[in-house]
Amino acid sequence: MMVKAGCGTDAVIKEITPLLQPGDVLVDGGNAYFGDTRRREEEIRPTGIHYVGTGISGGEVGALEGPSIMPGGSKESYEIIGPVLEKISAHVDGEPCCAWMGTDGAGHFVKMVHNGIEYADMQFIGEAPSLLLAAGFNKAEEP
C-alpha cells in the first residue's frame, strides 16, 4: 500500500482489512510517522494480519531500478515477505538494499532519520555558496 501519510492511510486500512485473512501481510510503504505505525500495528495485531511499516527510498531511479527498502513489523512478517522485498530492491555488489529494521514502527522510524539526513544535506548544499561568499571567498578566485 502506497498512500499519503495520515488519515488516508487509516481509511484504506479500514477498507481493506475486512478483505484480508489471518496470516496475510499488509505492507505500508507510505511516509508514515512511526508513532502512527506503532498504533496501526497494535490495532491490526489482534486480527492476525501482519502490518509492516516500510520505508522506501530511491525516487525515480529507485522506481525504475529498485529502491532501498526498510521494512519493520514482526520478524515473522519479514520471514514471509523478505524474499520478495529483497528481489525487488536495489542491489549493491550483489547484496539487496533491504533488511528488517525491527519491530514497533522501526521501518518508518529509519525512513524518518534517512529523510532528516538527506534534507539536511540538501540544505547545506543549497546554503554553502552563500556561506562561502559571506566568509570572503570569491568564486572567481583560484584555489
Please give the residue ranges for each predicted region.
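Conserved NAD(P)H cofactor-binding loop of Rossmann-fold oxidoreductase domains
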Residues: V3
